[in-house]
Curated annotation (Swiss-Prot):
The gene is cysH. GO terms for molecular function: 4 iron, 4 sulfur cluster binding; adenylyl-sulfate reductase (thioredoxin) activity; metal ion binding; phosphoadenylyl-sulfate reductase (thioredoxin) activity. It is an enzyme of class 1 (oxidoreductase). Its cofactor is [4Fe-4S] cluster. [4Fe-4S] cluster binds at residues 137-138, 220, 223. This is Adenosine 5'-phosphosulfate reductase. NCBIfam families: cysH, PRK02090.1.
Amino acid sequence: MMTAEVRTPEQGGGPLTTEPRAPRSAPGHADASAPAFGPETDPRDIIRWALAAHPDLLMPSAFNLNGVVLLDLAAQAGYRGEVVFVDTGYHFPETLATRDRLESRYPELTFVTLNAGASPDDGQTPPDLYASDPDACCAARKVDPLQRYLKEQGPSALLNARSRDQASTRADIPFVEEGGARRRVNPLAHWTREQLEAYAAEHDLPVNPLYFDGFLSIGCWPCTRAVKPGEDARAGRWAGKGKTECGLWQGENKL
Protein backbone atom coordinates (compact mmCIF):
# COMPACT_ATOMS: atom_id res chain seq x y z
CA MET A 1 0.00 0.00 0.00
CA MET A 2 1.38 3.41 -0.99
CA THR A 3 2.40 5.93 1.62
CA ALA A 4 1.27 9.45 0.82
CA GLU A 5 1.72 12.80 2.46
CA VAL A 6 -1.77 13.94 3.39
CA ARG A 7 -2.83 17.43 4.33
CA THR A 8 -6.18 17.12 6.07
CA PRO A 9 -8.80 19.88 6.35
CA GLU A 10 -8.88 19.92 10.15
CA GLN A 11 -10.18 22.86 12.15
CA GLY A 12 -7.45 25.47 12.31
CA GLY A 13 -5.12 23.65 9.90
CA GLY A 14 -3.04 21.08 11.74
CA PRO A 15 0.43 19.67 11.09
CA LEU A 16 1.57 17.88 8.01
CA THR A 17 1.14 14.14 8.52
CA THR A 18 2.35 11.05 6.75
CA GLU A 19 0.03 8.10 6.94
CA PRO A 20 -0.81 5.03 4.88
CA ARG A 21 -3.79 5.51 2.63
CA ALA A 22 -6.33 2.73 2.97
CA PRO A 23 -8.20 1.74 -0.19
CA ARG A 24 -11.71 3.06 -0.20
CA SER A 25 -14.58 1.13 -1.64
CA ALA A 26 -16.04 3.00 -4.57
CA PRO A 27 -19.60 4.04 -3.81
CA GLY A 28 -22.28 3.32 -6.29
CA HIS A 29 -22.66 6.00 -8.90
CA ALA A 30 -25.22 6.82 -11.50
CA ASP A 31 -24.33 5.10 -14.75
CA ALA A 32 -25.76 8.01 -16.72
CA SER A 33 -24.67 9.42 -20.01
CA ALA A 34 -23.21 12.89 -19.81
CA PRO A 35 -25.58 15.73 -20.66
CA ALA A 36 -25.00 17.71 -23.84
CA PHE A 37 -22.70 20.35 -22.37
CA GLY A 38 -21.78 23.27 -24.62
CA PRO A 39 -19.14 26.02 -24.77
CA GLU A 40 -21.36 28.32 -22.70
CA THR A 41 -21.99 25.78 -19.93
CA ASP A 42 -20.80 27.01 -16.55
CA PRO A 43 -17.93 24.71 -15.49
CA ARG A 44 -19.46 24.54 -12.03
CA ASP A 45 -22.55 22.89 -13.50
CA ILE A 46 -20.34 20.27 -15.13
CA ILE A 47 -18.59 19.67 -11.81
CA ARG A 48 -21.92 19.36 -9.99
CA TRP A 49 -23.08 16.81 -12.55
CA ALA A 50 -19.81 14.89 -12.11
CA LEU A 51 -20.21 14.87 -8.33
CA ALA A 52 -23.75 13.52 -8.62
CA ALA A 53 -22.78 10.86 -11.16
CA HIS A 54 -19.48 10.00 -9.45
CA PRO A 55 -19.46 10.61 -5.68
CA ASP A 56 -15.94 9.16 -5.59
CA LEU A 57 -14.63 11.83 -7.98
CA LEU A 58 -10.93 12.62 -7.52
CA MET A 59 -8.85 15.57 -8.76
CA PRO A 60 -5.18 15.21 -9.78
CA SER A 61 -3.38 18.53 -10.18
CA ALA A 62 0.02 20.00 -11.02
CA PHE A 63 -1.20 23.50 -10.01
CA ASN A 64 -0.74 25.17 -13.37
CA LEU A 65 -3.05 28.08 -14.26
CA ASN A 66 -5.78 25.73 -15.50
CA GLY A 67 -5.51 23.62 -12.38
CA VAL A 68 -5.69 26.58 -10.00
CA VAL A 69 -8.81 27.91 -11.75
CA LEU A 70 -10.44 24.47 -11.74
CA LEU A 71 -9.66 24.00 -8.06
CA ASP A 72 -11.42 27.26 -7.20
CA LEU A 73 -14.44 26.41 -9.36
CA ALA A 74 -14.61 22.90 -7.89
CA ALA A 75 -14.61 24.24 -4.34
CA GLN A 76 -17.47 26.59 -5.28
CA ALA A 77 -19.38 23.69 -6.83
CA GLY A 78 -19.18 21.64 -3.65
CA TYR A 79 -16.19 19.40 -4.29
CA ARG A 80 -14.74 18.27 -0.96
CA GLY A 81 -12.48 15.45 -2.07
CA GLU A 82 -8.78 14.98 -2.60
CA VAL A 83 -6.42 17.12 -4.67
CA VAL A 84 -3.61 14.74 -5.64
CA PHE A 85 -0.15 16.02 -6.59
CA VAL A 86 2.83 13.89 -7.61
CA ASP A 87 6.20 15.12 -6.35
CA THR A 88 8.61 14.00 -9.07
CA GLY A 89 11.64 15.37 -7.26
CA TYR A 90 12.22 17.83 -10.09
CA HIS A 91 9.53 20.43 -9.45
CA PHE A 92 10.39 24.11 -9.32
CA PRO A 93 10.36 25.55 -5.78
CA GLU A 94 7.68 27.94 -7.01
CA THR A 95 5.41 24.99 -7.82
CA LEU A 96 5.75 23.53 -4.33
CA ALA A 97 5.12 26.96 -2.83
CA THR A 98 1.98 27.32 -4.97
CA ARG A 99 0.73 23.99 -3.64
CA ASP A 100 1.23 25.21 -0.08
CA ARG A 101 -0.59 28.49 -0.77
CA LEU A 102 -3.52 26.61 -2.25
CA GLU A 103 -3.68 24.28 0.73
CA SER A 104 -3.93 27.27 3.05
CA ARG A 105 -6.61 28.89 0.91
CA TYR A 106 -8.84 25.79 0.62
CA PRO A 107 -8.94 24.06 4.03
CA GLU A 108 -12.12 22.26 2.98
CA LEU A 109 -10.08 20.12 0.57
CA THR A 110 -7.61 17.33 1.32
CA PHE A 111 -4.25 17.79 -0.39
CA VAL A 112 -2.36 14.55 -1.03
CA THR A 113 1.27 14.54 -2.18
CA LEU A 114 2.52 11.28 -3.67
CA ASN A 115 6.27 10.58 -3.60
CA ALA A 116 6.61 13.24 -0.92
CA GLY A 117 10.21 14.33 -0.47
CA ALA A 118 11.43 12.96 -3.80
CA SER A 119 14.69 14.38 -5.13
CA PRO A 120 16.97 13.92 -8.16
CA ASP A 121 19.34 11.87 -6.00
CA ASP A 122 16.80 9.51 -4.45
CA GLY A 123 17.69 6.58 -6.73
CA GLN A 124 14.23 6.22 -8.28
CA THR A 125 15.72 6.77 -11.73
CA PRO A 126 19.24 6.92 -13.19
CA PRO A 127 20.87 10.36 -13.23
CA ASP A 128 19.86 12.45 -16.24
CA LEU A 129 17.23 9.96 -17.38
CA TYR A 130 15.09 12.99 -18.19
CA ALA A 131 17.60 13.84 -20.94
CA SER A 132 18.25 10.38 -22.35
CA ASP A 133 14.72 8.96 -22.11
CA PRO A 134 12.12 11.52 -21.00
CA ASP A 135 9.25 9.06 -21.55
CA ALA A 136 10.80 6.61 -19.10
CA CYS A 137 11.47 9.40 -16.61
CA CYS A 138 7.86 10.61 -16.74
CA ALA A 139 6.61 7.04 -16.40
CA ALA A 140 8.73 6.28 -13.35
CA ARG A 141 8.40 9.56 -11.50
CA LYS A 142 4.93 10.77 -12.42
CA VAL A 143 2.67 8.30 -14.19
CA ASP A 144 3.41 5.13 -12.19
CA PRO A 145 2.95 6.68 -8.72
CA LEU A 146 -0.40 8.15 -9.71
CA GLN A 147 -1.52 4.95 -11.42
CA ARG A 148 -0.75 2.96 -8.27
CA TYR A 149 -2.63 5.43 -6.10
CA LEU A 150 -5.67 5.38 -8.36
CA LYS A 151 -5.63 1.59 -8.33
CA GLU A 152 -5.73 1.68 -4.52
CA GLN A 153 -8.41 4.36 -4.29
CA GLY A 154 -10.55 3.21 -7.22
CA PRO A 155 -12.27 6.45 -8.31
CA SER A 156 -14.73 6.01 -11.16
CA ALA A 157 -13.95 9.47 -12.59
CA LEU A 158 -11.25 12.14 -12.51
CA LEU A 159 -11.67 15.90 -12.57
CA ASN A 160 -9.14 17.36 -14.98
CA ALA A 161 -8.11 20.89 -16.01
CA ARG A 162 -7.06 20.42 -19.64
CA SER A 163 -8.37 22.85 -22.26
CA ARG A 164 -8.42 22.81 -26.04
CA ASP A 165 -6.25 25.84 -26.63
CA GLN A 166 -3.28 24.53 -24.63
CA ALA A 167 -1.84 22.62 -27.59
CA SER A 168 -2.80 21.07 -30.91
CA THR A 169 -2.73 17.65 -29.23
CA ARG A 170 -5.59 18.81 -27.00
CA ALA A 171 -7.68 20.60 -29.63
CA ASP A 172 -10.52 18.07 -29.55
CA ILE A 173 -10.82 17.43 -25.82
CA PRO A 174 -14.49 16.81 -24.90
CA PHE A 175 -16.12 17.76 -21.64
CA VAL A 176 -16.39 14.09 -20.73
CA GLU A 177 -13.98 11.42 -21.98
CA GLU A 178 -15.11 7.83 -21.94
CA GLY A 179 -13.00 4.69 -22.18
CA GLY A 180 -10.08 3.46 -20.17
CA ALA A 181 -10.26 2.72 -16.48
CA ARG A 182 -12.51 5.68 -15.67
CA ARG A 183 -14.19 8.78 -17.00
CA ARG A 184 -12.19 11.99 -17.31
CA VAL A 185 -14.25 15.14 -16.78
CA ASN A 186 -12.84 18.33 -18.33
CA PRO A 187 -14.98 21.32 -17.25
CA LEU A 188 -12.54 23.84 -18.77
CA ALA A 189 -12.33 22.16 -22.17
CA HIS A 190 -13.56 25.25 -24.04
CA TRP A 191 -11.96 27.95 -21.90
CA THR A 192 -9.27 30.10 -23.50
CA ARG A 193 -6.09 31.31 -21.87
CA GLU A 194 -7.58 34.80 -21.75
CA GLN A 195 -10.62 33.52 -19.85
CA LEU A 196 -8.42 31.66 -17.39
CA GLU A 197 -6.19 34.67 -16.79
CA ALA A 198 -9.18 36.97 -16.32
CA TYR A 199 -10.83 34.59 -13.85
CA ALA A 200 -7.61 34.15 -11.86
CA ALA A 201 -7.10 37.92 -11.67
CA GLU A 202 -10.71 38.63 -10.72
CA HIS A 203 -10.61 36.10 -7.88
CA ASP A 204 -7.01 36.85 -6.82
CA LEU A 205 -5.97 33.22 -7.18
CA PRO A 206 -2.46 32.10 -6.16
CA VAL A 207 -1.03 31.47 -9.63
CA ASN A 208 2.48 30.04 -9.91
CA PRO A 209 4.72 33.14 -10.29
CA LEU A 210 6.66 31.42 -13.09
CA TYR A 211 3.57 31.82 -15.26
CA PHE A 212 4.18 35.55 -15.44
CA ASP A 213 7.73 34.89 -16.65
CA GLY A 214 6.42 33.06 -19.71
CA PHE A 215 6.19 29.55 -18.27
CA LEU A 216 2.62 28.96 -19.45
CA SER A 217 2.78 25.22 -18.71
CA ILE A 218 5.00 24.19 -15.84
CA GLY A 219 6.36 20.71 -15.26
CA CYS A 220 9.74 19.52 -14.05
CA TRP A 221 12.55 22.06 -14.26
CA PRO A 222 14.88 20.07 -16.57
CA CYS A 223 12.13 19.72 -19.19
CA THR A 224 10.37 23.11 -19.00
CA ARG A 225 11.25 26.43 -20.59
CA ALA A 226 9.44 29.72 -21.09
CA VAL A 227 7.16 29.90 -24.12
CA LYS A 228 8.06 32.14 -27.05
CA PRO A 229 5.53 34.59 -28.54
CA GLY A 230 3.05 32.79 -30.78
CA GLU A 231 3.78 29.32 -29.40
CA ASP A 232 1.24 26.96 -27.83
CA ALA A 233 1.02 27.12 -24.06
CA ARG A 234 2.68 23.70 -23.85
CA ALA A 235 5.48 24.40 -26.35
CA GLY A 236 7.91 24.83 -23.46
CA ARG A 237 7.47 21.24 -22.30
CA TRP A 238 10.13 18.74 -23.49
CA ALA A 239 11.21 21.19 -26.21
CA GLY A 240 13.25 19.44 -28.89
CA LYS A 241 12.44 15.98 -27.52
CA GLY A 242 9.59 15.11 -29.89
CA LYS A 243 7.36 14.74 -26.84
CA THR A 244 4.23 16.69 -25.97
CA GLU A 245 2.53 14.76 -23.14
CA CYS A 246 3.74 13.12 -19.94
CA GLY A 247 1.56 10.05 -20.49
CA LEU A 248 -1.11 10.70 -17.87
CA TRP A 249 -3.81 11.63 -20.36
CA GLN A 250 -2.70 10.10 -23.65
CA GLY A 251 -1.20 6.79 -24.69
CA GLU A 252 -1.75 3.21 -23.65
CA ASN A 253 -1.19 3.93 -19.95
CA LYS A 254 -3.47 6.97 -19.74
CA LEU A 255 -5.49 7.41 -16.58
